Regions:
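Conserved class I S-adenosyl-L-methionine
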Residues: 1-7, 99-126
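Short alpha-helix
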Residues: 141-160
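A short SAM/SAH-binding and catalytic strip from SAM-dependent methyltransferases
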Residues: 66-80
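A short glycine-rich, Lys/Arg-flanked "PGG" loop and its adjoining helix->strand segment in the class I
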Residues: 82-94
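Class I SAM-dependent methyltransferase SAM/SAH-binding core
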Residues: 10-56
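Core SAM-dependent methyltransferase catalytic element
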Residues: 162, 166-181
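A short acidic, Gly/Pro-enriched loop at the edge of an enzyme's catalytic core
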Residues: 55-67
Length: 181
């Protein structure tokens, strides 16, 4: 199995994928993150890293069995979300799986608390509590963190002619699984 992680960051998910696949490719737009991923994953022969944008990937069509964009990447990347899904579908083989994840609405209080801690440590701006709600966290410095709910995932998928399977896990995450036709 050949897997691709979009927005691999420092390699936390890559490291877990390595024992389960023949080859895993991680892409990110941050060279600093990719350098950290090299160290964190201890550069295994079955790992490839590339500095690349997830909405315009330089891979051939149908190159991967599994394409992942987890940890709310579909919202965190600040890109055209439908284009991201279109590209993920393009590079995934027929019968392969595209797997996306975001936060469950049930996880709102925990998520907001985490952002408040980050704000208190000046890692992000002060939270604008009047503008924050419905899965969207807004900071007074202009930063905005969103999520994709079931309806959003279904809308993206139907616009591209594919059918998603949405699963909620532990009242914390929503997973959107699409088997590529």
């Amino acid at each position: 199995m050949v897997a691709l992680e979009l927005g691999c960051g420092y390699g936390r998910v890559l490291k877990r994928l390595l024992p389960a696949v023949d080859l895993v490719v991680g892409i990110d737009t941050s060279l600093a993150s990719l350098r950290m991923a090299l160290r964190f994953t201890e550069l295994k022969p079955s790992l490839r890293l590339a500095c690349m944008d997830a909405i315009s990937m330089g891979f051939r069509d149908r190159s991967f069995d599994l394409t992942l964009c987890v940890q709310n990447g579909i919202c965190a990347f600040a890109v055209d979300q439908q284009q991201l899904l279109r590209e993920a579908l393009r590079v995934t083989r027929s019968g392969g799986v595209v797997l996306l994840s975001s936060y469950s609405p049930q996880f709102w209080e925990h998520r907001l608390e985490w952002f408040e801690i980050q704000s208190a440590h000046h890692l992000i701006g002060e939270i604008d509590h009047r503008a924050t709600g419905n899965g969207v966290i807004v900071c007074k410095d202009g930063f905005c963190a969103t999520t994709a709910d079931q309806t959003t995932f279904e809308k993206f998928a139907s616009g591209l002619g594919v059918t998603p399977r949405i699963t909620e896990v532990d009242d914390s995450s929503l997973f959107c699984e699409i088997v590529v036709p």
